[in-house]
Amino acid sequence: MELSRIRNFCIVAHIDHGKSTLADRLIQKAKIIDDRQFQNQILDNMDIERERGITIKSQAVTIPYVAADGVEYELNFVDTPGHVDFTYEVSRAIASCEGALLLIDASQGVESQTLSNMYLALEHDLEILPVINKIDLPAADIPSCKHQIEHDLGLDPDDAILVSAKQGQGIDELFEAIVKRIPAPKPSDDNSTKALIFDCHYDPYRGVVVHVRVFSGSLKVGQTIRFMSNNAEYKIEDVGIFKIKLEPKDELSAGSVGYFIAGIKTVSDIRVGDTVTSAENPAETPLAGFKEVKPVVFSSIYPMDSNDYDELRDSMEKLKLNDASLTFEKDSSVALGHGFRCGFLGLLHLEVIQERLERDFDQSVIFTAPSVRYSITLTSGEEIFVDSPAEYPDQGRIASAREPYIKASIITPATYLGSIISLCTEKRGTQTNMQYLDEKRVEVTYEMPLSEVLFDFYDRLKSYSRGYASFDYDVIGYRDTELVKIDILLNGKSVDALSQLAFKGNAYDRARHVCEMLKEEISRQQFKIAIQGAIGSQIIARETVNPVRKDVLAKCYGGDITRKRKLLEKQKEGKKRMKMVGDVELPQSAFLAVLKTKEAD
């Protein structure tokens, strides 16, 4: 296919603005799949995505299109996630495209992720095509949407295409706008082969399937290719394009988006953002890859059975292949054995990884309480970064501590502004800006600690605003804080896997919450169990699980009181001895309960 007839674009938008539904309509219109095989959210091929109704992985697909003037085009497009935790997926999709469809819900208008995704596209010089979706809804307000496109986004509202992805309205006009307004890939002056790896997945029979965008040269079956980051060489066994399923081709030429398989079994050889070149005529310089993503939430993960450690490691490596933003390193715990310390982009990312490990890889795992990465200055003047309670130094060695702060942008209907301001203030937020976008919508900007957003902020924000508020954030640096380590003790023994780092002002509530949760989860034993929350040697919270006891007086009908007292004393001695040797068994549900946040007020 000539370069001038190829169009590469992605669909970006806020959560629930209809990206996957629009992708469904484009695919149906192109007739690349039989109606019998078609299902909604066709590109969302994970069970989690379908159940939650969200997109987690960007998915590429190639569709043919014959324009009104009779010219045939090849359209490569990527359906992207909308949630703030998966912005990295969006940025990778954007790097392999020349244009972006910016989708706006006609009933909701411009929201926080709409803005941040547009700025991402502008950073990469993409042609932005605004699309107003859901025009069939009774609540659709098209004039207001056009006003927001002009004033909030700075785009020409007359360029906006009106569609209803659900009903299929306006899809023909959208196709024509794509071929007319999104530019074709630029021809390269360099004759050497250069292809950017923007994703991968693991096939148990064929090894690693590498997703690429070819910028110059071509990739063919039988060609020997080289990865420029580590000089590993492989021979291509198969190349092709994505038409929902993999469709083999003879070659991938410049401008194309597709895949290649080269019998790669060493998962660590592949790095998303790397450049693939030809081993015979290698390129001198690699393509600009992706910005290294920095995890913001950390949690340790352990197998339920310590014998499954090697299986868990293999699963983590295969998962990292398909999710480049996941980071992990070896970790160990006295209570839980060997495991991994993992970095995530947010709490939803953590939940998704946990579900994928359990469903896709059949792993039973325990996650510890999530934490952020703190900066600690020791009395010796040395600065260290700590994201795990196990690494936390003695309080006497700490001169000062700092925690990461975020700039949070919240767009909400004016009706709910009061309760949202109260929530942000409770979460130690400082308001930096507030502006009315129109008579009904307000944007408020807060600077607040990232650790406060981890627990129940997002749920409560949605609850207070009846689901209408939208939230986006950027990490802006570190600020001073008062940090303490909360230890959880069971009958005087510290359980390292339940320890947490917390702001001093929240420590009492956090410790009490964990103790209450554990009391509900730990089954009664034959001896009393004391559950305590402590900072250093000071106990700040306590709950008690009462013992089960046998009625030793059941056989005594009347008789001397000293006989009864003797039996009770004997039972008491036995309980004391049992407590000395008895270990408290913690069920997996106890670890999961600690992760649960307090219900929104």
Ranges and model annotations:
Residues 1-601:
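Structural and coupling elements of P-loop NTPases
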